[in-house]
């Protein structure tokens, strides 16, 4: 008789990130490699949309950086910035110094871009990425935690939450018209 062990108890440290997102990857590079294999077409679409150099940056982040090296919130924010083509802090500083004749970018804050002003194809890719890595809807009645960090604030809400919000706006408009 052959015995097989069906499961192993593994301790996974979860890192707090924006409400609605859960990335419980114990070994992020290995799990991202598995996700890339299972979602090959999606990852090709990302490469074709964002350019080869940016895709190479993402692959390095996804496949080589552990949770100890890059916390979950930073992992998501960096992925989002690259996928949506937000300029990095270094690029922003270079752009500001070129336009204002300044050489220091340490005192200026990065410009926040709204999701409505971005390329819909890139927004769609970002949302697909979030679905690939997993969303966990917040528990109703959840207690308020400490205010989110700037890295957590930069991560957009769940597409499900955005859809629910837009549906309720449409219903309100219909009620007003009636």
Curated annotation (Swiss-Prot):
<feature type="compositionally biased region" description="Low complexity">
    <location>
        <begin position="98"/>
        <end position="109"/>
    </location>
</feature>
<keyword id="KW-0539">Nucleus</keyword>
<feature type="region of interest" description="Disordered">
    <location>
        <begin position="89"/>
        <end position="115"/>
    </location>
</feature>
<feature type="region of interest" description="Disordered">
    <location>
        <begin position="136"/>
        <end position="178"/>
    </location>
</feature>
<feature type="compositionally biased region" description="Acidic residues">
    <location>
        <begin position="167"/>
        <end position="178"/>
    </location>
</feature>
<dbReference type="GO" id="GO:0005634">
    <property type="term" value="C:nucleus"/>
</dbReference>
<protein>
    <recommendedName>
        <fullName>Uncharacterized protein C191.01</fullName>
    </recommendedName>
</protein>
<keyword id="KW-0963">Cytoplasm</keyword>
<dbReference type="GO" id="GO:0005829">
    <property type="term" value="C:cytosol"/>
</dbReference>
């Amino acid at each position: 008789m052959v015995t097989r062990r069906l499961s192993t108890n593994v301790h996974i440290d979860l890192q707090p990130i924006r409400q609605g997102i859960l990335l419980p990857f114990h070994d992020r590079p290995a799990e991202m490699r598995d996700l890339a294999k299972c979602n090959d077409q999606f990852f090709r679409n990302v490469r074709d949309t964002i350019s080869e150099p940016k895709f190479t940056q993402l692959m390095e982040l996804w496949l080589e950086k552990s949770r100890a090296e890059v916390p979950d919130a930073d992992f998501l924010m960096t992925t989002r910035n690259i996928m949506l083509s937000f300029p990095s802090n270094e690029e922003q500083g270079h752009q500001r110094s070129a336009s204002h004749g300044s050489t220091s970018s340490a005192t200026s804050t990065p410009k926040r871009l709204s999701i409505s002003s971005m390329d819909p194809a890139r927004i769609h890719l970002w949302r697909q990425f979030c679905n690939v890595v997993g969303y966990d809807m917040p528990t109703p009645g959840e207690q308020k935690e400490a205010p989110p960090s700037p890295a957590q604030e930069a991560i957009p809400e769940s597409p499900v939450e955005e859809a629910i919000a837009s549906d309720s706006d449409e219903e309100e408009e219909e009620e007003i018209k009636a």
